[in-house]
């Protein structure tokens, strides 16, 4: 009895209300789920007593416990009768490896006779009998409690204390929820009141037995679904199957042990999820029924521990699989959290078990235990994705690279597309295509040779492949296996097997013969049947073809093949079915890449062995380098190189330096000075080439808007070098928004100290005065980067100038019409500039006036070329683009900002340099460029004539970089 006093006393609720339906169902569900992982003896609580006078249970040994994968042993007659007369649910439930069945107590014959006599004599239900026999049961419990306290004294006390505390906490949360939502959750009595009401209802209806009919029980309460704990436990492997835990004696309060501190909060999450995803997820329990069961501990236990995984549709699965990496990391970390972790989201739509593990429906497609040999799949977006062994993350398909482009890099598919599938338009009617037009099935009768049917690709094999290979897998040989794999010309008839007609070549599987444009076959290789992989390779260098079987080379089958051949496969008897692989998947024959490397080496050795007929390569290369340096006006470098190689100049050195100066002016944006030097040094060049002059003028107009050629306003001024700002404002906008400062300097001087922005990278264009102290347009400073227009005075530079207002590129875009429309728009802008009458504004206005005047002159020049029919479409577009820059307050960020890029000056300088050399009777291009262009053209000609070597030659091979 001392051991009984040490153990915590059983609650009055549990002792007096042993047959309460809520506690009984919760205890029964707990015994089914095996959440505690221990054996539950039927005599540990009066709510689980199935006989009036149970005997003390005998602890079962590890050998007596049944294996979790095998069913429980059949019950004897006494146990069957006791369960039929018991008010508790004994419907069959699935057994999992976490829980071992409770040991059954033997029932003697006198006890059975005594129980039958009591049932015949007494009319009250079994509940009253059990209440009357409770003192005897308490006496029988004492030895069992002594044993429990001896084995687990401290653990049992701590567990019961935690259980009682959690149970009262959950009951308080449930009452608080009912008070907040009186409409959604109807008021229900507390645990004590419901148990009292249960006894009163039983006493009021003594004639109605509470014994359930075993035939109706499965319909009234179906077996519970799989537990998340069970599935989570099965993931750990099969080594836990034989592990046995010591038996624990659990009373009615133990049902709260599987409910953690977040149980009620997670129950609320289930209801919130039902409201949010009602259209895309199916919930097993009705929401109204669930709300009515939340107030009971059994309902909370069922909702928390036994959760049916909903079936997600493909529409709802897609957005969840596209979560970012942060969500993936968060979901991965949640798998290692315990049951008290508060990092779980309330709005999650996944399911969490009692130990904090994260589950989703994708992880368990079928509720079958996974074997220990199954490897775990990675989680993506909180869901487990099952990968197939065939899919490799290192394959080109997963890296976003076309494998055919890697296999045939020299093929230009815009001109000669690669065969990638069978053509649905170039086939016989008896042929059926499926699986992206890669699977071929015969659908004819197949009685005669005329019943043969073939299919080919939509495009022929490009000769620029050099070496082309494809494979065909025999899915089924059909009735007779009359199949042919080969090559055909475009005019091949599709009711014949490849090889029977002219310009068709095939390898047949029924006899292993090769057919070359004839009905008479030649002995070639073995036959092939279901499961074999047949490959066909075409060599465009020597115009041969060979076949492979299951990765083994069978030797050359055909020679002297024509060009433009199509991959073809032919079938003849019912049931024949094949799959094609044109390079999308790895080949069975893995020596294609090595063969291509060997052929490439042979072609390069052939080029190196070609005899040099003219002179030694050293002298030829020296002349090529010298002419290239002279052509591009690298005067100092050319002079040093010719002195080292003992070569002479064909052009005067002074002419080379003049061209060099003009090229530098163009590259720095000083178009007006470049044009002036060209007219002075090479008279008659621009006058006789009006199109070139017009192109230079268009570029000059662009540089004026850019601010690099402001000296065009006055020919006596020069400008320093420019930089390319990222947010430059046009000269037009700067002059329109110019404001004169009212600073108290007295002399009207200005300060240009604020000439750079935060990036400190731009250098302003300074206009230097050439005479006179009066401020004029030549005394203007335009800061291209800081959007300031500053007046410069030769006496002092101390007075600050207000910065011009910065405008975004939100100006109205004007349509690029003809030249007259552009001139009218320029006139309108010119009239607008007359509004500002301040002296400084007039100076800035003169700048824009000069730009507009130059634009009118350029427009007139374009009209003159139009009259003489000398204007090309390229020059017409150039003029429209240049005039369109006026419409933007920030030309750099406009759609035409590429015109202001310094790289656009190179083409203008190259054109002018070539024109100058041509006027001096020199070549427009250096000889080195001619050689490179000639070699490129020869490679194209080789490909056009289907010689095959072009697949293994590039410009870098002919002219190596090192």
From Swiss-Prot:
Record's compositionally biased regions (Basic and acidic residues): 80-91, 165-202
Taxonomy, superkingdom: Eukaryota
Domain CTLH: 655-712
PANTHER family referenced in this protein's UniProt entry, alphabetically: RAN BINDING PROTEIN 9-RELATED
Keywords: Cytoplasm, Membrane, Nucleus, Phosphoprotein
Function as written in the Swiss-Prot or TrEMBL entry: May be involved in JAK/STAT signaling. Isoform D is required for the proper arrangement of niche cells and is autonomously required for proper niche cell size, isoform C negatively regulates the adhesive properties of the niche. The germline stem cell (GSC) niche in ovaries is made up of two somatic cell types: 8-9 cells in a single-filed array make up the terminal filament (TF), and a tight cluster of 5 or 6 cap cells (CpC).
Modified sites of kind Phosphoserine: 387, 393, 395
Intracellular or extracellular location(s): Cytoplasm; Membrane; Nucleus
Organ and tissue specificity: Expressed in the GSCs and in dividing cysts. Expression is reduced in the germline as individual egg chambers are formed. Isoform C is expressed in all somatic and germline cells of the ovary. Isoform D is expressed in the GSC niche.
Domain LisH, chain residue ranges per copy: 617-649
Biased composition (Low complexity): 1-33, 41-52, 118-132, 321-343, 806-820
GO CC aspect terms: cytoplasm; GID complex; membrane; nucleus
Name the record gives this protein: Ran-binding proteins 9/10 homolog
Segments forming domain B30.2/SPRY: 400-587
Chief location category: cytoplasm
């Amino acid at each position: 009895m001392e051991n009984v006093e040490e153990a915590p006393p059983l609650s009055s609720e549990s002792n007096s209300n042993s047959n309460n339906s809520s506690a009984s169902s919760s205890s029964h569900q707990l015994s089914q789920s095996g959440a505690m992982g221990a054996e539950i003896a039927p005599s540990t609580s009066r709510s689980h007593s199935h006989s009036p006078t149970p005997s003390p249970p005998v602890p079962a040994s590890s050998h007596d416990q049944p294996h979790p994968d095998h069913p429980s042993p059949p019950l004897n007659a006494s146990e069957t009768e006791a369960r039929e007369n018991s008010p508790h649910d004994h419907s069959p439930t699935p057994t999992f490896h976490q829980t071992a069945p409770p040991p059954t107590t033997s029932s003697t014959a006198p006890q059975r006779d005594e129980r039958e006599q009591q049932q015949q004599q007494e009319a009250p239900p079994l509940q009253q009998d059990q209440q009357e026999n409770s003192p005897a049961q308490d006496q029988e419990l004492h030895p069992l409690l002594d044993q429990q306290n001896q084995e687990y004294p401290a653990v049992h006390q701590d567990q019961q204390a935690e259980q009682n505390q959690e149970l009262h906490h959950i009951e308080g949360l449930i009452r608080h929820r009912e008070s907040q939502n009186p409409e959604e959750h109807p008021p229900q009595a507390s645990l004590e009141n419901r148990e009292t009401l249960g006894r009163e209802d039983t006493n009021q209806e003594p004639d109605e037995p509470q014994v359930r009919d075993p035939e109706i029980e499965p319909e009234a309460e179906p077996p519970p679904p799989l537990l998340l704990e069970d599935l989570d436990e099965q993931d750990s492997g099969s080594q836990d199957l034989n592990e046995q835990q010591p038996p624990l004696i659990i009373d009615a309060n133990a049902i709260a042990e599987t409910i953690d501190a977040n149980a009620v909060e997670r129950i609320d999450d289930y209801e919130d999820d039902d409201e949010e995803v009602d259209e895309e997820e199916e919930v097993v329990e009705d929401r109204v029924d669930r709300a009515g069961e939340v107030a009971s501990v059994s309902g909370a236990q069922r909702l928390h521990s036994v959760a049916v995984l909903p079936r997600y549709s493909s529409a709802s699965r897609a957005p969840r699989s596209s979560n970012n990496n942060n969500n993936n990391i968060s979901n991965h970390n949640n798998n290692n959290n315990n049951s008290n972790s508060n990092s779980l989201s309330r709005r999650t739509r996944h399911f969490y078990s009692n130990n904090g593990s994260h589950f989703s429906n994708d992880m368990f497609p079928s509720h079958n235990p996974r074997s220990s040999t199954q490897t775990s799949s990675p989680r993506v977006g909180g869901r487990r994705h099952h990968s197939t062994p065939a899919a490799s993350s290192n394959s080109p398909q997963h890296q976003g690279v076309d494998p055919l482009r890697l296999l045939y890099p020299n093929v230009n598919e815009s001109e000669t597309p690669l065969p990638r599938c069978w053509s649905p338009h170039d086939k016989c009617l008896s042929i059926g295509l499926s699986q992206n037009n890669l699977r071929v099935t015969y659908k004819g009768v197949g009685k005669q040779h005329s019943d043969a049917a073939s299919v080919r690709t939509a495009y022929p094999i490009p000769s620029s492949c050099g070496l082309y290979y494809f494979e065909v897998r025999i899915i089924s040989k059909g009735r007779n296996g009359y199949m042919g794999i080969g090559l055909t010309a475009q005019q091949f008839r599709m009711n014949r097997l490849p090889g029977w007609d002219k310009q068709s070549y095939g390898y047949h599987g029924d006899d292993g013969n090769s057919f070359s444009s004839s009905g008479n076959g030649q002995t070639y290789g073995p036959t092939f049947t279901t499961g074999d992989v047949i490959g066909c390779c075409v060599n465009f260098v020597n115009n041969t073809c060979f076949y492979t079987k299951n990765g083994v080379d069978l030797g050359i089958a055909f020679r002297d093949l024509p060009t433009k051949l199509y991959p073809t496969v032919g079938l003849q008897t019912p049931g024949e079915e094949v799959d094609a692989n044109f390079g999308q998947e790895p080949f069975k024959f893995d020596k294609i890449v090595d063969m291509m490397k060997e052929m490439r080496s042979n072609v390069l050795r052939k080029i190196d062995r070609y005899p040099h007929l003219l002179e030694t390569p050293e002298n030829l290369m020296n002349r090529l380098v010298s002419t290239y340096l002279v052509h591009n006006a690298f005067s100092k470098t050319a002079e040093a190189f010719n002195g080292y190689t003992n070569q002479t100049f064909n052009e005067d050195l002074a002419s080379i330096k003049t061209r060099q100066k003009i090229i530098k002016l163009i590259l720095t944006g000083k178009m007006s000075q470049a044009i002036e030097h060209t007219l002075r040094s090479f008279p008659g060049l621009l006058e006789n080439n009006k199109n070139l002059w017009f192109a230079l003028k268009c570029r000059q107009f662009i540089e004026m808007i850019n601010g690099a050629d402001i000296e065009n306003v006055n020919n006596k001024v020069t400008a320093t070098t420019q930089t390319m700002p990222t947010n430059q404002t046009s000269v037009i906008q700067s002059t329109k928004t110019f404001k004169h400062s009212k600073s108290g300097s007295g002399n009207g001087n200005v300060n240009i100290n604020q000439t750079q922005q935060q990036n400190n990278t731009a250098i302003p264009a300074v206009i230097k005065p050439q005479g006179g102290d009066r401020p004029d347009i030549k005394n203007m400073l335009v800061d291209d980067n800081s959007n300031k227009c500053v007046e410069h005075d030769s006496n002092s530079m101390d007075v600050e100038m207000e910065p011009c207002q910065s405008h975004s590129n939100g100006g109205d875009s004007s349509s690029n019409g003809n030249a007259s429309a552009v001139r009218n728009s320029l006139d309108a802008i010119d009239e607008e500039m007359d509004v500002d009458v301040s002296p400084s504004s007039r100076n800035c206005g003169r700048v824009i006036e000069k730009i507009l005047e130059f634009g009118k002159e350029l427009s007139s020049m374009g009209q003159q070329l139009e009259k003489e029919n000398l204007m090309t479409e390229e020059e017409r577009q150039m003029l429209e683009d240049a005039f369109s820059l006026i419409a933007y307050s920030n030309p750099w960020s406009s759609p035409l900002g590429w015109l202001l890029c310094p790289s656009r000056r190179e083409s203008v300088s190259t054109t002018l340099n070539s024109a100058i050399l041509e006027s001096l009777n020199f070549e427009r291009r250096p000889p080195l460029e001619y050689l490179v262009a000639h070699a490129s053209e020869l490679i194209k000609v080789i490909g056009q004539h289907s010689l095959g070597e072009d697949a293994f030659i590039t410009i870098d091979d002919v002219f190596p970089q090192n």
